[in-house]
Amino acid sequence: MTHPLAEKFAKTFGAQPDLMAQAPGRVNLIGEHIDYSQGFVLPFAIDLYTSVAIRKRNDGIVRIASSQRNQNFETFEVSEIKPGYGTGWAKYPLGVLWALEISEGLDIFIDGKVPSGAGLSSSAALECSLAFAINELFHLGRSLKDLALLSQKAENDYVGVPCGIMDQSISLMGKSGFALLIDCSDLSTTLVPLDLTRADLQLLIIDTGVHHALVDGGYAERRASCESAAAKIGVASMRQLSAALLENNQKNLTNSEF
């Protein structure tokens, strides 16, 4: 039986994919606005995924389609891929191709089950599933840590979102039944058992109705406040900040920085 994703790919592009991959969204248990301050975070992967199917082309053309956009593809020139090229949602997969320095054409079909704008890292799931697939298809030999950093680079430098490294790390390195303790100063990780069923517990993910947008939301402002506060206090990042040091410098900080 043909995989449903392969069927969608074939219907859109007229051929079977060379390779398929998927990566999950995530929930963070603790550590908000900490990853870009080099602190500790404790996310875990969820059972909602973004899947990709890809196929090599020999003409330097990149065609990208999504089941969330009526399976119609957009066409790009691989030689033109650099920050500023492409618009909207297509900048995410284009950014991954740019970060991984891909110079060959591709057909890419994306099937996302992670709700967009829900704070579950749909963008990281897209980036990581595609980065993993490209790494396998082109035999790049990149580690999962490398792929996380390259996916973050795509979002930071191509899409223009100053996200930290947490979302990409858990999407690529998460494991069922575990949370992942990430030290964002060096990306060292520790699997932490999270067997909720055995403890007779359930963790609820509730839709608050508030749309989460990293590109035009308050995320960039919050990160800028953290970085400017650290600079004023004289530390490399907020991770190095003690409660006493923060209190002693309150008069030098704006309300948002404090």
Regions found by a protein language model. Name each.
Residues L48, E104, I108, D200-Q202:
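Residues at beta-strand starts and edge strands
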Residues G31-H33, I46:
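N-terminal cofactor/phosphate-binding cores enriched in small/glycine residues
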Residues P43-A45, A53-K56, E101:
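Short, charge-rich binding segments
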Residues Q38-A45, R222-R223:
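Short Gly/aromatic-enriched secondary-structure transition segments
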Residues M1-R26, S51-G86, L181-F258:
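C-terminal nucleotide
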Residues I46-L48, M173-S176, T197-D200:
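A short, structural micro-pattern
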Residues M1-L19, N28, S37-F40, F73, ...:
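Gly/Ser-rich oxyanion-binding loop with an adjacent helix/lid
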Residues D47-Y49, D59, P115, G177:
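A generic structural motif
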